[in-house]
Amino acid sequence: MTAPASKLLQPITVGPLELKNRIMFPPLTTGYEERDGSIGERSLAFYERLARGGVSYIVIGDVAPVMTASPTPKLATDAQIPTFKALADAVHKHGAKVALQLFHPEYDVPGVGRMVMGSMAAAKAAQEAKAAGDEETFAAKMAESNEIRKRAYAKLHHDMQHFVNEASVEQLTQIEEAIAASAARAQQAGIDAIEVHGDRLVGSLCSAILNKRTDEYGGSFENRVRYALEVVAAIKEAAPELMVEYKLPVIMENPDGTPRGKGGLLPDEACEFAKLLEGAGIDMIQVAQANHTGNMGDTIPPMLPV
């Protein structure tokens, strides 16, 4: 066995965690969760197989602290804790550790959610009218449902571009509290670590390209990273037993000098921010390119042997 390979298999200590080797499974979404975001049998089988195969550290990607319409894991209510405990137990059985990557999407979740629920209610009323033979009400309710859904998609598209600048301080505080509450549930479930998703909303606030706010969360570098540091502090207070890491997205340059990615920090800023994260008690930093969807030309396609 070569020296690099033997190093890969050596144990390492990261914050409070003792990892049996340096083989990690990065955060990604599988779509294997239940409809409410809980961990079901398919998810359990997938992650336990990784742990049984020798992976020492598994990160569950895109875990939402609120009930969104997106098909991602969610740890937003106490009722979901037992399913995440089952996940932790399954992974621990093979000597591995498990982390949750907590994120909040870049849109007004309650606002979009109310519109989606309104569309579903109108569609249900339409089906009831059809069953009763009332074709006029059926047509009217279906038209209402479609119109509400259309407005929901329009709001979602708008928010993905503008929510970072339109969200009130009160909304940002509520999101921070939801993330902290989810971290506390993770600790209760026996999860080992939390990864702060530094892309998405948090990364958009850090970005000099996307963040146009004029309050305490916008403008200077110190203001733009303020929210990220507040989220880190809230997690560490809510779940003091857990290791905390940070996904740090970096905005790179294309050959023509244009930015590659928007939600994140420029390289020089990222270096300064890494020091602030260390001072805030972050145990590990995962560096990634900002907005990886802008990098698809350089991405290995799914299922391609390497």
Spans of model-derived segments:
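Flavin-dependent oxidoreductase catalytic cores
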Residues: 1-306
